[in-house]
A protein has these predicted regions:
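Divalent metal-dependent catalytic cores for phosphoryl transfer on phosphate-bearing substrates
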Residues: 8-125
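Charged phosphate-binding loop/patch that engages nucleotide di/tri-phosphates or the phosphate backbone
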Residues: 131-154
Length: 154
């Protein structure tokens, strides 16, 4: 939807690598793959959309697209642990969701996260995800990503 197009548009504007642009476009596809209500977080349910999204994306796209999708929630938990100002910028709904997802990770978990070769890509995707919440933003149409998308297919 609109959020995904904004994230991908911002990735293009920042000159991100193709895998990040495509991951930005697909990172929340897991929300479309489950049957949970939109207010699942308010009901105390973590929809695990990053895992559902990863399974779908990993089936069709290169690992360097799929892995940041899988890690984009972990990247939020990582940033909350590493950057107090990041945690301070989260909206009330984001804080509710953060706690459902397990809250900020420990120092040991941070070190483990940093061992993943795609952790920097995941953090970059997370920052794009956070910025892609502007009402009525002018964005590139979905069709403009066709070449990038096909280039990242398995």
């Amino acid at each position: 939807g609109e959020h995904a197009l904004q994230a991908a548009h911002l990735a293009m504007e920042e000159g991100c690598a193709a895998n990040i642009v495509v991951a930005s476009l697909l990172h929340d596809i897991g929300h479309m793959l489950h049957a949970l209500p939109d207010d699942a977080p308010e009901q105390g349910i973590d929809d695990l959309h990053e895992e559902l999204g990863f399974r779908f994306v990993d089936k069709y796209f290169k690992h360097e697209v799929a892995e940041p999708v899988r890690l984009h929630v972990a990247a939020k938990r990582y940033l909350c642990a590493k950057e107090p100002e990041y945690l301070g910028r989260l909206s009330e709904p984001s804080i509710i969701i953060l706690h459902l997802q397990g809250g900020p990770i420990t120092e040991a978990e941070c070190r483990l996260f940093e061992q993943n070769p795609f952790y920097r890509d995941a953090v970059q995707l997370r920052r794009l995800d956070d910025l892609a919440k502007v009402p009525n933003m002018e964005v590139r149409p979905l069709d403009s990503y066709r070449t990038l998308l096909t280039g990242q297919l398995k």
